[in-house]
């Protein structure tokens, strides 16, 4: 009807206890502009706190950079830069920019060329490891095609070389850390500060209780040793929890318990839940690495439930590795090298292990029809 205002009955009855025309006192007293100005001031101060070391010789495969320091509350971020040109003008090229943003709790990697930044990378193999007022040690390993970054002895991320490459860098710089130190040498292993790997225990059968000598706590994204390998007719069992926001995880059987030099991977099992996640089954990729990746085996066979407990098995057969998840076979990979070469296990990503052990495969699950 013209001239008549009609209101929603439900809206008329709603009463949220807010008086029209008033703003909460806390918002009146909080000066957002001043807070933003303080943050910009802190960023400017962080850029001015620099420690630069000129390289006596170019970085090469095996170059090892160790940076130590302690983040402080008045500097909201810090960075490790590997670059060339004038390091103080702010216009030099940066081959690798490792930017730790403490308020946001993530680390950005990027490259700057001709004053233009590229695409940021933020993914990592572990949770954010830095805290205010807690000392840190960052290790940087320069490889042929990438740099590897470890924090406090644990591998954190990798960053593929862009243009310009760190192999043509002339300096390394730490910005935003007042007590920073830098040490640049060569190494034949990475990370140098890694704790000794845990040995995977052997049990008599799959439901056998753990021995008192077994590890009680398994770290995510860890490497463990298999001193006697995986004997034929035995299986590697990983029981753990899946991340609620399941993205992906990988399990590798390798010929050495190390991150670098890159070990041979006899079997690589990668569950990629993020690829077309609307489909009823997750993508499983199987492969092997002997200096380069071989031919992939790809199939949609996993039906994992995020946030739940799961049991993952890799069984050594007569001529193949068989992979099971929760009593269902999700893939097979033929031997691409002698299986006796397996001496280590590595798991990464969204599978958090609680029990890991070897046992005979006599009670293996059956193939799902």
Regions found by a protein language model. Give the residues of each.
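Peripheral membrane interaction modules
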Residues: 2-137, 141, 145-147, 154-311, ...
């Amino acid at each position: 009807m013209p001239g008549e205002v009609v209101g929603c009955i439900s809206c008329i009855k709603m009463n949220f206890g807010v008086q029209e025309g008033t703003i909460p006192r806390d918002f009146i007293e909080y000066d957002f502009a001043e807070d933003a100005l303080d943050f910009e001031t802190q960023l400017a101060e962080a850029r001015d706190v620099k420690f630069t070391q000129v390289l006596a010789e170019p970085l090469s495969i095996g170059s090892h950079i160790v940076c130590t320091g302690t983040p402080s509350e008045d500097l909201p971020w810090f960075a490790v830069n590997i670059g060339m040109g004038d390091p103080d003008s702010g216009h030099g090229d940066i081959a690798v920019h490792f930017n730790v943003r403490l308020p946001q709790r993530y680390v950005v990697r990027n490259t700057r060329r001709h004053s233009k930044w590229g695409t940021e990378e933020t993914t990592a193999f572990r949770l954010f490891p830095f805290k205010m007022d807690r000392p840190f040690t960052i290790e940087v390993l320069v490889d042929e095609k990438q740099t590897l970054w470890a924090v406090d002895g644990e591998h954190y991320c990798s960053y593929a070389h862009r243009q310009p490459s760190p192999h043509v860098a002339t300096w390394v710089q730490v910005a935003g850390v007042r007590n920073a130190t830098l040490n640049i040498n060569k190494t034949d292993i990475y990370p140098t500060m890694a704790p000794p790997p845990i040995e995977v225990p052997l049990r008599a059968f799959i439901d056998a209780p753990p021995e008192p000598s077994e590890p009680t706590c398994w770290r995510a994204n860890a490497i463990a040793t298999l001193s006697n390998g995986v004997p034929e007719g035995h299986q590697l069992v990983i029981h753990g929890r899946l991340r609620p926001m399941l993205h992906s995880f990988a399990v590798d059987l390798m010929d050495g318990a190390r991150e670098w030099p890159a070990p041979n991977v006899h079997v690589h099992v990668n569950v990629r839940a993020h690829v077309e996640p609307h489909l009823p089954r997750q993508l499983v990729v199987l492969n092997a690495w002997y200096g380069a990746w071989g031919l992939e085996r790809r199939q949609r066979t996993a039906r994992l439930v995020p946030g739940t407990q799961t049991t993952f098995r890799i069984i050594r057969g007569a001529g193949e590795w068989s992979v099971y998840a929760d009593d269902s076979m999700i893939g097979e990979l033929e031997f691409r090298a002698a299986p006796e070469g397996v001496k280590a296990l590595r798991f990464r990503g969204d599978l958090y292990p609680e029990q890991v052990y070897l046992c005979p495969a006599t009670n293996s699950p059956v193939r799902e029809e």
